[in-house]
Amino acid sequence: MKKIMLIASAMSALSLPFSASAIELEDEVGLECGPYAKVGVVGGMITGAESTRLDSTDSEGKKHLSLTTGLPFGGTLAAGMTIAPGFRAELGVMYLRNISAEVEVGKGEVDSKGEIKADSGGGTDAPIRKPFKLTPPQPTMMPISIADRDFGIDIPNIPQAQAQAAQPPLNDQKRAAARIAWLKNCAGIDYMVKDPNNPGHMMVNPVLLNIPQGNPNPVGQPPQRANQPANFAIHNHEQWRSLVVGLAALSNANKPSASPVKVLSDKIIQIYSDIKPFADIAGINVPDTGLPNSASIEQIQSKIQELGDTLEELRDSFDGYINNAFVNQIHLNFVMPPQAQQQQGQGQQQQAQATAQEAVAAAAVRLLNGSDQIAQLYKDLVKLQRHAGIRKAMEKLAAQQEEDAKNQGKGDCKQQQGASEKSKEGKVKETEFDLSMVVGQVKLYADLVTTESFSIYGGVGAGLAYTYGKIDNKDVKGYTGMVASGALGVAINAAEGVCVDLEAGYMHSFSKVEDKYQVNAFIASACVRYNF
């Protein structure tokens, strides 16, 4: 019995240390598992962002200018939970500012007008011009000549029997296609317009209801003014005749003070002026003269042909440079009015020739008024104007032209002095973007190596980033995109329940800000973590 008691007491004594160790371990686990808070500072380096500006010295137009990026910095705040010894889950918010990048441009300075000057590549200081607004010449209503009026009055409809026999049968608008074309070409009026009260539907142009009809000298006491029509039927010959006569009278009453030749010349000069910066880049010579007031019919024809050839050459030069632009060829297809052809063939007297000249010029103005090809070219040039490489090339050309103008009146000595000064000019950097970012992520951490004084851990995270700031010195709307990150760090036990986390990682963005810049970053942080 004594032996049994001794064995039992010995076993009890041996088991006591193990019980104490278990209790101590349970206490340690209880301290490690629980919530914590973390606060700290962050900094890093941007990677992945590429300039949208093309290097103008690259002949292929594919090389982008290099970016000099800033060093973003900010702070972080997080709350987490130790879910098991060595494993943590965390919800954190990080704020980064100074996410900026600069691109090298020509030497800049501010002139007396407050304009920034840029190096032309040849080295001359010239103001950087804001992109000029490209708009096609506004339509000019030309007076309807007597010949056009008489021609319009006699335009017939396609007979209804013939229209029904056609395959497929012609509707009412196609029956009156010739009259509708006259309205557009000679009067600048669309027969059908959108119905403001019924979206998606068309209606007869209300302008056609404002043309007086009926006897211009009505009887009655007192005499009544000409009737306003309640409706307009384009197939009704009497209504059509009254409409043509009324339009001709109104157009002559409101005709521009300048002659048709002067109006045409001004339009052509404006088009040439608008396209010249682009033509200079493409190496195309653009005429700089309009039409003389005494221009003959042949000169007008030749000028329209010259305009069409120049526009087509410009379009062809940029065909394929950007997507969905400069695709359709330009053919103005100017056709002289029939009355001008007759007068030209008959060798008319001076007064008749002047009338024919005005008729041809007016017809050319109407052609430019309604040219969808010219309107499309302007739209394509607006797209081209936004291209970074073209914009820089236009700035360089403008600066070079100013340099040439200055040097033209200077002597050789001043030119040599200017050249020596230009060789000393350096480069300046222009901010391409300056952004700030707020990032919210869920992160998971796991200890890789653990000692009494420190531990080495790794972690992954995913979340959302809200980016805002300026691009090309213009405010951009806030942009939200997904991010993911990975990190490796060291946690130093500073005091009971307090750790200092030194962490380095990489954050990847899955989308681009304004479809231009993908902002990824290497990030380092120093945080204090307090376990509750």
Curated annotation (Swiss-Prot):
Q: Where is this region: Disordered?
A: 113-140, 400-426
S-S bridge residues: none
**Superkingdom of origin organism:** Bacteria
Gene3D superfamilies in UniProt:
2.40.160.20
The answer to keyword Kinase applying to this record is no
Return the Basic and acidic residues bias intervals.
Answer: 403-413
Q: Name one Pfam family in it.
A: TSA
Which InterPro entries does this one have? Answer: OMP/PagP_b-brl (IPR011250), TSA (IPR004933)
Q: Does the keyword Ligase apply?
A: no
Membrane-related topology note? Multi-pass membrane protein
Protein name, entry field: 56 kDa type-specific antigen
Where in this chain does the entry annotate a coiled-coil region? none
UniProt KW keywords: Cell membrane, Membrane, Signal, Transmembrane, Transmembrane helix, Virulence
